[in-house]
């Protein structure tokens, strides 16, 4: 009873005791009455007597600490692409007015309590409404993210601007990362040669941007791209100690970084392969290069021979069994350092020919085929022209890479001239045994005489195409490669070669092959049907165009690329020399070398980014101060391209679509689909 009286005396107006206690219920009731007390009202703000200023003060005091500042932050896009942020003073008065209006007389709510007329106090910690949601012109709000909007004046100015070729800033800048790359392939002099000291030799060795080392698990040096044994012996010992330490802990060392150099280690049985690079390549790319060096060793020794050597004597010096093949290892390593699209994409490059012309060559190849033949290849300047193979058998690109390196990079076989009979292990085909390769280069003088004699002996025969011109470049050399499993088939394959050379000379195929090789790779402006970029500043096209591209057909494991001219055949101005005529050709070669490496470094970065382990990217667009680049991956093809830094993403995408459509139209000319099968 006392409790009921006490409850009834409560008038419900006290802010500190606003709850109502339910009355006592008799025990006869099964359940107690569940009366939910109302939520206490929020204290209403008390306005001061000083008008608007007091209202502003109370409004500011009542705001939660999580409120976003009401300062109007906007961005301005400048013509050079940069942006700046600033606060607009014109809207400060508006903000003040809105803040003044935010505090008004209270109004009653549905719950029976009073609350402010506006919802600002209730919702300010939940949402913020910036004043520049839809800015005009170059103004873009930070929240909307419209950073790429351009004014009409800027768009008109852009169409009149000259196209900038890729890497122009790097070519003239003092902080070029490839400074001194032209000396990368210079041999380190012997101790005492030209008065050079051991410290100078060590300095030259450390200045190299890329190193490859091969050593045995016992620490015996086998091969190194730079430096002789006396120079690198101690370093190989350190490398062997580090690798062995991690292997003893059952945690093999795969790679590490020291300064700006990346160390990647690959263990293949009793051999350790080490790559040291300052060229920005990924671990996967460096490891694939080390695998290629391992394949080169297997092509000389075969896997069973290599195992037997180290099973009986783990400390065997492998330099003696590999004697004479150092040039093959060096040329293969140098191709990686210069930048090899074939190694990067794991694909082959084919010579562009008409489908009918390639079919004619394949038919002539098959007609002259010997029973002892396993594979037959015609190669022009490192590009595959024709291949005949057994049904359901094909050569792996890594095996063909070893063959092309032997023929066109090392120069050993070409320097010998005439015909060559080479025992060779193709590891991807069979790493346990040898095949025998007959190699012969077509002599243009010989084929010209054959053409003339055929026309003289057969006056009724229709006139033949003009004979091939003398070879003036390694890219125009044509070689025939006949592979057999029979080591006694040299003369039979030689006879096949003679018949094939005569047949190709009669139908004019040799001239067509040499003409296609001399024509070179397709140019960008021809594919896009645009005007070529001028080398002089200010002469470029306003819309710009691609400078280079790589296109890989995944189904055919082949790729094509555009010509490096003109964007990547010029570099920094020529160095001053006392004899310009003597230094002209070497300077041009150096410029091409550095430009090619700069381009391939960007391609390596693109390839590594889009093929990252946990990446699911299909299209990647990168823009830097030097260049704009694009990578596009589908189940059918891989596409990579490079353009100048001022090229917009829209125009770059349009050009990429045109190139992809062109590649699909020209697929049977660009790639060998199937080849000759017997």
Curated annotation (Swiss-Prot):
Its main location: membrane. Residues 10-20, 87-105, 450-459 have a biased composition (Low complexity). The keyword Protein transport applies. Residues 1-116, 449-474, 568-591 are annotated as: Disordered. It holds the Pfam family Fuz_longin_3. Residues 63-77, 106-116 have a biased composition (Polar residues). It comes from the Eukaryota. The keyword Transcription regulation does not apply. It is found in: Endosome, Multivesicular body membrane; Prevacuolar compartment membrane; Vacuole membrane. GO terms for cellular component: fungal-type vacuole membrane; Mon1-Ccz1 complex; multivesicular body membrane. Keywords: Autophagy, Endosome, Membrane, Protein transport, Transport, Vacuole. One of its GO terms (biological process) is protein targeting to vacuole. InterPro entries: FUZ/MON1/HPS1_longin_1, FUZ/MON1/HPS1_longin_2, FUZ/MON1/HPS1_longin_3, Mon1. It is a peripheral membrane protein. Residues 460-471 have a biased composition (Pro residues). In complex with CCZ1, is required for multiple vacuole delivery pathways including the cytoplasm to vacuole transport (Cvt), autophagy, pexophagy and endocytosis. The MON1-CCZ1 complex acts at the fusion of vesicles with the vacuole, through its regulation of the SNARE complex during the coordinated priming and docking stages of fusion, and particularly at the stage of tethering/docking. Belongs to the MON1/SAND family. This is Vacuolar fusion protein mon1. It comes from Neurospora crassa (strain ATCC 24698 / 74-OR23-1A / CBS 708.71 / DSM 1257 / FGSC 987). The gene is apg-13.
């Amino acid at each position: 009873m006392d409790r009921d009286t006490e409850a009834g005396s409560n008038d419900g107006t006290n802010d500190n005791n606003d709850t109502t206690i339910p009355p006592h219920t008799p025990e006869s009731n099964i359940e107690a009455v569940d009366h939910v007390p109302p939520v206490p009202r929020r204290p209403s703000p008390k306005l001061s007597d000083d008008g608007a200023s007091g209202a502003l003060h109370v409004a500011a005091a009542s705001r939660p600490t999580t409120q976003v500042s009401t300062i109007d932050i906007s961005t301005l896009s400048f013509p050079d692409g940069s942006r700046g942020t600033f606060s607009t003073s014109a809207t400060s008065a508006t903000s003040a007015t809105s803040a003044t209006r935010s505090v008004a007389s209270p109004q009653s709510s549905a719950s029976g309590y009073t609350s402010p007329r506006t919802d600002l106090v209730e919702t300010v910690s939940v949402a913020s409404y910036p004043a520049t949601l839809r800015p005009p012109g170059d103004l873009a709000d930070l929240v909307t993210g419209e950073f790429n909007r351009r004014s009409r004046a800027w768009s008109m100015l852009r169409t009149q601007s000259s196209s900038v070729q890729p890497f122009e800033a790097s070519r003239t800048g003092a902080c070029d990362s490839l400074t001194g790359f032209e000396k990368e392939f210079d041999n380190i002099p012997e101790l005492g040669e030209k008065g050079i000291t051991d410290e100078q030799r060590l300095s030259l060795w450390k200045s190299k941007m890329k190193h490859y080392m091969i050593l045995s698990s016992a620490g015996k040096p086998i091969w190194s791209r730079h430096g002789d044994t006396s120079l690198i012996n101690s370093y190989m010992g350190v490398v062997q100690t580090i690798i062995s330490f991690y292997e003893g802990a059952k945690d093999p060392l795969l790679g590490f970084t020291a300064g700006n150099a990346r160390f990647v280690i690959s263990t293949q049985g009793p051999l350790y392969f080490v790559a040291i690079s300052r060229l920005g390549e990924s671990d996967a790319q460096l490891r694939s290069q080390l695998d290629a060096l391992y394949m080169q060793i297997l092509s000389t020794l075969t896997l069973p021979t290599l195992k037997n050597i180290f099973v009986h004597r783990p400390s065997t010096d492998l330099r003696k069994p590999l004697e004479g093949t150092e040039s093959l290892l060096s040329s293969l390593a140098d191709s990686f350092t210069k930048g090899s699209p074939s190694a990067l994409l794991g694909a082959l490059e084919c010579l562009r020919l008409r489908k009918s012309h390639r079919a004619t060559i394949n038919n002539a190849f098959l007609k002259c085929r010997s029973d002892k033949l396993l594979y037959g290849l015609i190669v022009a300047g490192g590009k595959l022209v024709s291949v005949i193979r057994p049904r359901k058998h094909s050569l792996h690109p890594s095996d063909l890479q070893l063959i092309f390196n032997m023929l066109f990079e090392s120069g050993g076989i070409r320097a010998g001239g005439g015909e060559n009979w080479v025992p060779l292990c193709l590891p991807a085909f069979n790493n346990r045994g040898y095949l025998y390769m007959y190699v012969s280069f077509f002599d243009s003088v010989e084929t010209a005489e054959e053409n003339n004699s055929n026309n003289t002996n057969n006056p009724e025969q229709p006139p033949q195409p003009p004979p091939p011109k003398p070879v003036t470049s390694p890219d125009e050399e044509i070689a025939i490669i006949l592979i057999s499993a029979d080591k006694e088939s040299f003369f039979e394959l030689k006879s096949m070669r003679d018949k094939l050379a005569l047949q190709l000379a009669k139908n004019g195929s040799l001239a067509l092959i040499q003409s296609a090789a001399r024509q070179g790779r397709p140019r960008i402006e021809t594919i896009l049907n645009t005007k070529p970029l001028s080398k002089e500043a200010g002469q470029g096209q306003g819309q710009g165009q691609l400078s280079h591209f790589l296109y890989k057909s995944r189904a055919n494991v082949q790729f094509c690329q555009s010509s490096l001219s003109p964007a990547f055949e010029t570099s920094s101005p020529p160095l001053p020399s006392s004899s310009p005529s003597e230094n002209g050709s070497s300077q041009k070669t150096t410029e091409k070398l550095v430009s090619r490496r700069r381009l391939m470094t960007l391609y390596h970065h693109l390839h590594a980014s889009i093929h990252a382990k946990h990446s699911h990217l299909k299209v990647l667009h990168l823009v830097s101060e030097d260049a704009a680049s694009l990578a596009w991956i589908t189940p059918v093809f891989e596409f990579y391209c490079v353009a100048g830094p001022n090229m917009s993403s829209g125009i770059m995408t349009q050009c990429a679509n045109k190139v992809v459509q062109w590649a699909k139209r020209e697929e049977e000319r660009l790639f060998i689909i199937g080849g000759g099968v017997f």
